[in-house]
Regions:
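Short catalytic/signature loops enriched in Gly
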Residues: 10, 14-20, 160-164, 256-358
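ABC ATPase NBD Q-loop/coupling interface
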Residues: 32, 86-104, 142, 213, ...
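P-loop NTP-binding/switch modules centered on Walker-like glycine-rich loops
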Residues: 59, 195-199, 203-285
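Conserved ABC ATPase "signature" region
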Residues: 90-93, 144-164
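ABC ATPase NBD coupling module
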Residues: 94-111, 137, 259-264, 295-301
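A short, proline-enriched helix->beta-strand linker immediately N-terminal to the Walker B motif
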Residues: 188-192
Length: 363
């Protein structure tokens, strides 16, 4: 089995000492339109290592998917333009790679599961051909070899009768099964990093749980790093090692899953937590929505971008953009008052009581 003669596999190269598998450093992606500049991603930073899961959470328009598409090199330029920052994979800048180099990266080193499998799968090609396409491109598999491996992958992700289903078309699969096909496609070349963009949004709760469990099983087996993009904090509650909360193109809070759920410091994160049905049940209170709408990314408010919707906003919030307040552990939040103990008493009940209850359980 031969690889393409021009094939470059960065996975064969070690991560440089002192660096991470993936490093996103102050990334800024703007779109220049006739109506103005859209600051879609404005200062995103995080690191990721093999075996880790990062949850990226926020409402529609927060910049979650644009960040992922920038990493994959799938943003059209123009109108998109990198205004600052860098993305490094195994020590190499992705933003400086040529399109030919990125074609070797996509699907092989970094793979992506898109939000809607029905529009991501080609309706006129059989599933086996689509799952095996990456293997033929990146691994030099023959048509027969790719089909055999595609059958194995469908079996791996829990699709019954894979020998039969590999010769069927996307419309013959249910929504949950199509999403499993997308996961099989993404895992075909054993990527270092798997980006899952709202992979469970259109699925019912039972199928959501199955898809998340499947991704966790694949990660345990292969050691992939996962970036899980979602608008629902509840989806990443038991899956993520660390979580970045985004709002209006900016990261407003970042920390371990434990810190975000039980020591959160930003009012927007509190709003997302209170929007989780299980949290409302725990507090014995009705669901509390975040009132208002996200701002236009072409006309962001002065000061804190969340201030028009924040129930705790002051004149300082409305006039000054907050700096990130960072704790010793690296947990940060972009709020003027996130270091104020009295202000933090406004956090959801779970955030304020988790530590005490854990101590009580350990005693």
């Amino acid at each position: 089995m031969k690889k393409n003669k021009n094939y470059v596999d960065l996975k064969d190269q070690p991560v440089p000492e002192g660096q991470h598998l993936l490093e996103v450093d102050d990334l800024k992606m703007y779109f220049h339109t006739e109506d103005g500049v859209v600051r879609a991603v404005d200062g995103v930073s995080y690191t990721l290592d093999r075996g880790e899961t990062l949850g990226v959470v926020g409402e529609s328009g927060s910049g979650k998917s644009v960040t992922a598409m920038t990493i994959m090199g799938l943003i059209s330029m123009p109108p998109g333009k990198i205004e600052g920052g860098d993305v490094r994979y195994r020590g190499r800048s992705i933003l400086e790679m040529t399109e030919e180099e990125m074609q070797h990266i996509r699907g092989n080193d970094i793979a992506m599961i898109f939000q809607d499998p029905m529009t991501s799968l080609n309706p006129v090609y059989k599933i086996g051909r689509q799952v095996g396409e990456g293997l033929r491109l990146h691994r030099g598999y023959s048509k027969q070899e790719a089909l055999k491996r595609a059958t194995e992958l469908l079996d791996l992700v829990g699709i019954p009768e894979p020998e039969k289903r590999v010769n069927e078309y996307p419309h013959q699969f249910s929504g949950g099964m199509r999403q499993r096909v997308m996961i099989a496609m993404a895992l075909a070349c054993d990527p270092d990093i798997l980006i899952a963009d709202e992979p469970t949004t259109a699925l019912d709760v039972t199928i959501q749980a199955q898809i998340i469990e499947l991704m966790q099983e694949m990660q345990e087996k292969n050691g992939n790093a996962i970036i899980m993009i979602t608008h629902d904090l509840g989806v990443v509650a038991d899956m993520a090692d660390k979580i970045m909360v985004m709002y209006a193109g900016r990261p407003v809070e970042f920390g371990t899953a434990e810190e975000i759920f039980y020591e959160s410091r930003h009012p927007y994160t509190w709003g997302l937590i209170r929007s989780i049905p299980e949290q409302a049940i725990e507090e014995k209170k009705p669901l509390t929505p975040i009132h208002g709408n996200p701002p236009s990314l072409m006309n962001l408010p002065e000061g804190c971008v969340f201030s028009p919707r924040c129930p705790y906003a002051t004149d300082k919030c409305r006039k000054q953009r907050p700096e990130r307040v960072v704790t010793e552990s690296g947990h940060y939040s972009a709020c003027h008052y996130s270091g104020d103990p009295e202000f933090l008493t406004n956090a959801p009940e779970t955030s304020r009581t988790r530590k005490d209850s854990k101590k009580g359980g350990e005693a």
